[in-house]
């Protein structure tokens, strides 16, 4: 099977999110161990990609992992060089003109500086596909060469002849050398919404196959991004390419003069429907040096990548949040990473079961993505640190809807969550009372139970650190108004899992209901009926009822 070239990110590690962190505090032995592990992971991905045309990891995450390895090697110079990711990507055929990489511009300031120093510029979408060199002689396609290591590649001519996007003949007798991107055709693909959709891997797999079938061949297009021995004028190159049967280049090339022009087209191609996946834009200067002088990263072209859809980052800590009902939610504290316009420092794993299945621990590297409504979520665990840091998780048997009615040791989180619910909009809607207020009262030792605040007056509140006279008066007034709330509102504030209760609800009548009576209520099924019945049987509830009765809450 033919080896496949992986398009390695050649940008300086300075611009990669994975490299922005300081050097790890490792001794040499630990550094060698961690670097060796990451090298082995990258080697596995490279082997699958280059030899089998399989992409085992998202391209963004691969690029960031490679940048992370480069950063570690700079931190620990005595550990030896990492293998060249392209060492096995070369092939027996030499490119007639070197396949170059691209300098990556980190931000708008870098783009503005690059533009200001050049003239006669053009912008094109940066197609997320597989690079190829085409050689025509006497009008006939002679060779199609994989990118390989940029200098040599493999013979793709047989499969290239099966692609309708590559003409078998050109109406030009002279030698024509074209460099471009084979891409997977997509229907109205919006990069901002759909991401790369695995497009690059599909093309890589297809071109690695020994026999390309007709249906697959029809899905592969070609975007010619350079004609090394073509006309000097960009307009002439674009027009002649279209006439020769390569229309995409002209359709998706625009002249630019300013950062504003470049920003417009970058945003347009990011959010508008296109027939291919992209991962940024390419800025090109019309004038180029002779092809024999092209370098690995030319000064006359640069890439401005799109915001990351997936980012590689380090897990700094694993915390556990215990909610009002005893639900345990694992939270990952992350090394800050930018995703689109969000700075992500923390994300939720949703459930204790999921954390246990993933076994995420401090030091692990994870891929983070934005889900609906720009909510960060864990995409995958990319690799794990060799030394597994211990994590003490709460015992789920200890926490449930009937636990932590008082701030006993280990109950601080659930008890505070009960207070926040009680005072919030879904409960008593206590004006000016939030988590900070409850925390201050807890730290002052004034809340031995869930309703002890009913007995606090302004004088007592004023003694709490951080609560002055004016705020104490407001809190006392808010607490006093709570006594006038109806019983139904109080029961919901205490955690009764019912959407609606009769306005003139009576405690004794509700507590005496059996399962059938609860299920007679609209929207109450067997499970909810059991929860409602269990609520009134909670051991702490009689004492709370007495507090309500003492302050005159009707229906108690």
UniProtKB/Swiss-Prot annotation:
Q: Which SMART domains match?
A: LIGANc
Q: Which InterPro entries match?
A: DNA_ligase, DNA_ligase_B, DNA_ligase_CS, DNAligase_adenylation, DNAligase_N, NA-bd_OB-fold, NAD_dep_DNA_ligaseB, NAD_DNA_ligase_OB
State any GO BP term from the record.
DNA replication
Which key words are in the record? DNA damage, DNA repair, DNA replication, Ligase, NAD
The record ties this protein, via HAMAP family, to: DNA_ligase_B
| NCBIfam families for this protein | PRK08097.1 (NF005987)
Name the family the entry cites.
Belongs to the NAD-dependent DNA ligase family. LigB subfamily.
The name on file for this protein is DNA ligase B
Source organism per UniProt: Stutzerimonas stutzeri (strain A1501) (Pseudomonas stutzeri)
């Amino acid at each position: 099977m033919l080896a496949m070239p992986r398009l390695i990110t050649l940008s300086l590690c300075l611009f990669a999110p994975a490299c922005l962190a300081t050097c790890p505090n490792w001794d040499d032995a630990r550094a060698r161990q961690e670097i060796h592990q990451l090298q082995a992971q990258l080697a596995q991905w490279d082997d699958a990609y280059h030899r089998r045309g399989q992409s085992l990891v998202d391209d963004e995450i691969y690029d960031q992992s490679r940048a992370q390895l480069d950063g570690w090697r700079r931190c620990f110079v005595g550990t030896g060089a990492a293998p060249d990711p392209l060492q096995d990507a070369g092939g027996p055929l030499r490119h007639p003109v070197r396949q170059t990489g691209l300098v990556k511009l980190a931000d708008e300031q870098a783009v503005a500086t690059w533009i200001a120093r050049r003239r006669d510029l053009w912008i094109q979408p940066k197609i997320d596909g597989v690079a190829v060199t085409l050689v025509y002689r006497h009008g006939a396609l002679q060779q199609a060469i994989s990118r390989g290591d940029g200098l040599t590649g493999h013979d793709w001519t047989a499969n290239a002849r099966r692609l309708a996007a590559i003409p078998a003949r050109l109406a030009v007798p002279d030698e024509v050398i074209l460099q471009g991107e084979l891409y997977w055709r997509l229907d109205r693909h919006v990069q901002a919404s759909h991401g790369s959709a695995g497009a690059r891997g599909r093309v890589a797999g297809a071109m690695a196959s020994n026999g390309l079938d007709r249906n697959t061949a029809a899905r592969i297009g070609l975007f010619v991004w350079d004609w090394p021995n073509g006309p000097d004028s960009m307009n002439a190159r674009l027009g002649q390419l279209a006439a020769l049967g390569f229309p995409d280049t002209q359709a998706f090339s625009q002249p630019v003069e300013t950062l504003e022009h470049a920003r417009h087209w970058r945003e347009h191609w990011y959010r508008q429907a296109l027939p291919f996946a992209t991962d940024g834009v390419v800025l090109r200067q019309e004038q180029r040096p002779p092809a024999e002088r092209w370098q690995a990263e030319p000064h006359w072209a640069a890439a401005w990548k799109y915001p990351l859809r997936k980012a590689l980052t380090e897990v700094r800590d694993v915390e556990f949040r215990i909610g009002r009902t005893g639900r345990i939610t694992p939270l990952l504290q992350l090394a800050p990473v930018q995703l689109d316009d969000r700075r992500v420092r923390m994300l939720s794993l949703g459930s204790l079961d999921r954390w246990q299945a993933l076994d995420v621990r401090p030091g692990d590297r994870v891929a983070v993505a934005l889900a609906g409504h720009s909510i960060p979520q864990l995409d995958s665990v990319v690799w794990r640190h060799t030394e597994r840091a211990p994590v003490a998780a709460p015992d789920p048997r200890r926490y449930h809807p009937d636990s932590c009615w008082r701030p006993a040791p280990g109950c601080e989180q659930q008890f505070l969550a009960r207070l926040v619910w009680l005072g919030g909009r879904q409960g008593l809607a206590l004006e000016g009372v939030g988590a900070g207020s409850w925390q201050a009262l807890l730290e002052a030792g004034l809340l031995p139970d869930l309703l002890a605040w009913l007995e606090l007056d302004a004088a007592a509140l004023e003694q709490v650190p951080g609560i002055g006279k004016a705020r104490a008066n407001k809190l006392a007034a808010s607490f006093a108004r709570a006594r006038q709330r109806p019983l139904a509102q109080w029961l919901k504030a205490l955690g009764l899992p019912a959407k609606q209760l009769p306005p003139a609800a009576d405690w004794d009548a509700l507590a005496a209901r059996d399962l059938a009576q609860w299920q007679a209520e609209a929207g109450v099924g067997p499970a909810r009926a059991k929860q409602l019945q269990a609520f009134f049987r909670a051991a702490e509830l009689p004492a709370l009822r007495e507090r309500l009765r003492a302050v005159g809450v009707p229906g108690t």
